[in-house]
Swiss-Prot record:
Gene3D superfamilies: Aldehyde Dehydrogenase, Chain A, domain 1 (3.40.605.10), Aldehyde Dehydrogenase, Chain A, domain 2 (3.40.309.10). This is Malonate-semialdehyde dehydrogenase. Homotetramer. Its EC number is 1.2.1.27. It comes from Listeria monocytogenes serotype 4b (strain CLIP80459). The lineage of its organism: Bacteria, Bacillati, Bacillota, Bacilli, Bacillales. It catalyses: 3-oxopropanoate + NAD(+) + CoA + H2O = hydrogencarbonate + acetyl-CoA + NADH + H(+); 2-methyl-3-oxopropanoate + NAD(+) + CoA + H2O = propanoyl-CoA + hydrogencarbonate + NADH + H(+). Keywords: NAD, Oxidoreductase.
Length: 488
């Protein structure tokens, strides 16, 4: 194998060779090609970045808010100019098709755009008269050094709802990107620096357990934002909180889609295919379970099977490909094991994605399991792959009861034209993000990404006004100004 480039950490505005004695291959999941190697950095390197970030915070937090916003606007413009390059990097190291990658880049740009509104977002409140000659004002201040732990499945969108907002509000930031998708972050760092961000304000340390524990334990770091699996999210929340940090942990999901008898059949099938199998099912807003009313079930499922069997599978850089690979071979094997567990427990496999006919890469085709029940492993666990479970129900009330049994409560969708049914769904379903006649109800940057139950640990969600509250603390000033001597 030819020499493979070893990535460096980004600390204090410089690319710094890691002191790690271990590197991991970064693999194109569609081909198996080794793209580069990423360091599994040491705790000492994270601690070094924390000291640098703390020093940078002292100056950056004093920069006028409009000036900070201009850096974010410049960053946004550079992202727009490099949109295609960024999308291709995502497809290369993550595997999702190029159209989906372009969509992710656009969502990342929108996150930066929202953060660039810092002058408005930072505004406090005031009351001119709370008592005789007494007024009060509420001011926002940045919390300090913030740590972020990002996943592989959205290597641009998720980090871009973390560090741009935190930095725009006056904080400094240390990011641990996924070691599976580091190349995109390398490009983002380059563009953020070009936009005029001072050295030390944004730092990137690649790694695994030691870096995560450093973020959670280092006293310099005041807040931690995490996106990833439920077990790791629980650990992050408990450990970070025990060390007196603010923590938001966005974790697993098992999103249910309800299809009622009056649903538009063609539109619903199109949306469910996209929601279940887009991004290879590796997203926390994927449709994992469909509960379909008996009156439309046969017709809907026949159309769904046909559509799933016609999905084009392959390298996301190739024209017309809809479904790319899962991220690694171990994910592929894990997914196949879940499918076989479903069969053992009595589910009916009506579309089998275990064999795709592709000789290289880590592919699982669209898979549909019917006759699923809520005691089955495939219904309970987050599979994080292009596997869809189907449950037939008698009515909306039963569909909601099924969904609400899940420990997860990230998103849920309904397909119907019945306003009463929509209202019932909205009021009774346990989930933080709801979709009506659409398959992926991920909100825009100015609304919170608001999972419930085991899908989220913390108080303040990512994005929206919650993110402003998360990355700032408040100072209320009460002042007396006597008007004595100015009487008319």
């Amino acid at each position: 194998m030819a020499d493979v480039r070893k990535l460096k950490n980004y600390i204090n505005g410089e690319w710094v060779e890691s002191r790690a004695d271990k590197y991991e291959d970064v693999i194109n999941p569609a081909t198996g090609e080794v793209l580069c190697q990423v360091p599994i950095s040491t705790r000492a390197e994270l601690d070094q970045a924390a000291v640098i970030a703390e020093q940078a915070f002292e100056k950056w937090s004093q920069v006028a808010v409009p000036r900070r916003a201009r850096v974010l606007f410049s960053f946004q413009q550079l992202l727009i100019q490099h949109k295609e390059e960024l999308a291709r990097l995502i497809t290369l190291e993550n595997g999702k098709n190029l159209s989906e990658a372009r969509g992710e880049v656009q969502r990342g740009i929108e996150n930066v755009e929202f953060a660039a509104g810092a002058p408005t977002l930072m505004m406090g409140d005031s009351l001119a008269s709370i008592a005789t000659d007494v007024e009060a004002a509420n001011y926002r201040y940045p919390v300090g050094v913030v740590g972020g732990i990002a996943p592989f499945n959205f290597p641009m969108m998720v980090p871009c709802w973390m560090f741009p907002m935190a930095i725009a509000l006056g904080n400094s930031f240390i990011l641990k990107p996924s070691e599976r998708t580091p190349l995109l972050m390398e490009k983002l760092v380059e563009l953020f620096s070009e936009a005029g961000l001072p050295k030390g304000v944004f730092n990137v340390v690649y790694g695994a357990h030691d870096v995560v524990n450093g973020i959670l334990e280092n006293e310099i770091i005041k807040a931690v934002s995490f996106v990833g699996s439920k077990p790791v999210g629980e650990y992050v929340y408990k450990t970070g909180s025990a060390n007196l940090k603010r923590v938001q942990a966005l974790t697993g999901a098992k999103n249910h889609t309800i299809v009622l008898n009056d649903a538009d059949l063609e539109d619903t099938v199109t949306n469910v295919i996209s929601a279940a199998f887009g991004s290879a099912g590796e997203r926390c807003m994927a449709c994992a379970v469909v509960t379909v009313e008996e009156g439309i079930a046969d017709e809907f499922l026949a159309a769904l099977r046909t559509a799933a069997q016609n999905v084009k599978i392959g390298n996301g850089l190739d024209d017309g490909v809809f479904l790319g690979p899962v991220i690694r071979e171990e994910n592929q094997k894990r997914t196949i094991a879940y499918i076989e567990k479903g069969l053992e427990e009595g589910a009916k496999l009506t579309v089998d994605g275990r064999e795709t006919g592709l000789s290289e890469g880590h592919f699982v085709g669209p898979t549909i399991l019917e006759d699923v029940t809520t005691d089955m492993t495939i219904w309970k666990d987050e599979i994080f792959a292009p596997v869809l479970s189907v449950i037939r129900v008698k009515n909306l009330q039963e569909a909601v009861r099924v969904a609400n049994q899940s420990e997860f409560a990230n998103g849920a969708c309904i397909f119907t034209n019945n306003a009463k049914a929509i209202r019932y769904f909205r009021e009774k379903i346990d989930a933080g993000m709801l979709g009506v006649n659409l398959g992926v109800p991920a909100p825009m940057a100015f609304f919170p990404f608001s999972g419930w139950k085991s899908s989220f640990y913390g108080t303040l969600h990512a994005n929206g006004k919650d993110s402003v509250d998360f990355y700032t603390h408040k100072k209320v000033v009460t002042a007396r100004y006597s008007l004595k001597g100015y009487e008319e």
